[in-house]
Amino acid sequence: MAIEKKFVNDGYVKASMDEYFAEQLSRAGYGGMELNRTPMGTQIVIYSEKPGMVIGKAGKVIRKLTRDVANKYSLENPQIDAQEVKRPELNAQMMASRLAASIERGWYFRKAGHNTLRAVMNAGALGCEVVISGKLTGARSRVEKFVDGYIKHSGNPVEEVVDEGFAVAVKKLGTLGCKVRIIQPGVVLPDSYKVRESVEVEEPAEKPAEKPAEKPAEKAAAPKKEAAKARAPAPAPEAPAPAPEAPAPAPVEEAEVAEPEEAEEVQAETSEEIEGAELVYVEGSDEVRRQVNGVWQHKHGSYDYWHPMARVHKEAKE
């Protein structure tokens, strides 16, 4: 047998066997079958709402099905297993059979279609499509569709993720075809995607720089430095220039001159700060200058100790 004919024959056997089981097990709630060929024989799994009716009393029904399948389809050592469907609302074949039974009992087709669609979606399906075709309300045949959720109609995903069931409802005006297509919950569709939420990355807070520990000598010099600034006299204001007509020059206010003891104390207090100060020597004189805490100081001649340059010296008496 050519390979093409073998595939056609296998498909015919499977479709014919499915119709046979649907006819024989309609009262048991037939929900589809699986056919697996193995070296040990042919394994057939029947899904049913009532597996007890598939097996029958003392296995009578299942033995009859096994004999009929072996003789009708020439299968070697067929083994039939019955399994229960826990959620019939997600089985397309069962829902199609229920829809056909509802229409045969006299339900209006639109009410039956909406009830079937609602039951499937409430069970958690991603999508469902119910199609009823035939003489619905008049002499002409027409098609009514009820769709909810997401349904694939073409491509390879139709064979992989879409469960399809079909049943026939026989009425006085004629037969009605009932088709139900379901996409099971949890199925990952090929065109599905997820949008990642932007995550804000928090920058670590900068720790304040730790100040180096002060040396004991610097700590002790700080209060002395403040005391020296407080005791230093403010510079005297400049005297106005004498008028040219006045014979005698205007008297100049004498600034307080630090006593030798005070000068020695200031010199002792500030000697520790001279290390970082830069000395400036004035050319042509014995004056030496430096800047301490933003104040220019100098020493020269008879005033051989550091004192502010803004201080007015007492004039030497003739």
From Swiss-Prot:
InterPro entries according to UniProt: KH_dom, KH_dom-like_a/b, KH_dom_type_2, KH_sf_prok-type, Ribosomal_S3_C_sf, Ribosomal_uS3_arc, Ribosomal_uS3_C, Ribosomal_uS3_euk/arc
Compositional bias ranges of the Acidic residues kind: 253-275
Role: Binds the lower part of the 30S subunit head.
Homology family: Belongs to the universal ribosomal protein uS3 family.
Biased composition (Basic and acidic residues): 198-229
GO biological process: translation
Annotated GO MF terms: rRNA binding; structural constituent of ribosome
Protein's name according to its UniProt entry: Small ribosomal subunit protein uS3
Record-level GO cellular component terms: cytosolic small ribosomal subunit
Pfam families: KH_2, Ribosomal_S3_C
Biased amino acid composition, Pro residues: 234-250
UniProt cross-references to PROSITE patterns, sorted A to Z: KH_TYPE_2 (PS50823)
Highest taxon, organism lineage: Archaea
Region of interest (Disordered), residue spans: 198-275
Gene it is expressed from: rps3
Subunit relationships: Part of the 30S ribosomal subunit.
Keywords in alphabetical order: Ribonucleoprotein, Ribosomal protein, RNA-binding, rRNA-binding
Residues annotated as domain KH type-2: 17-86
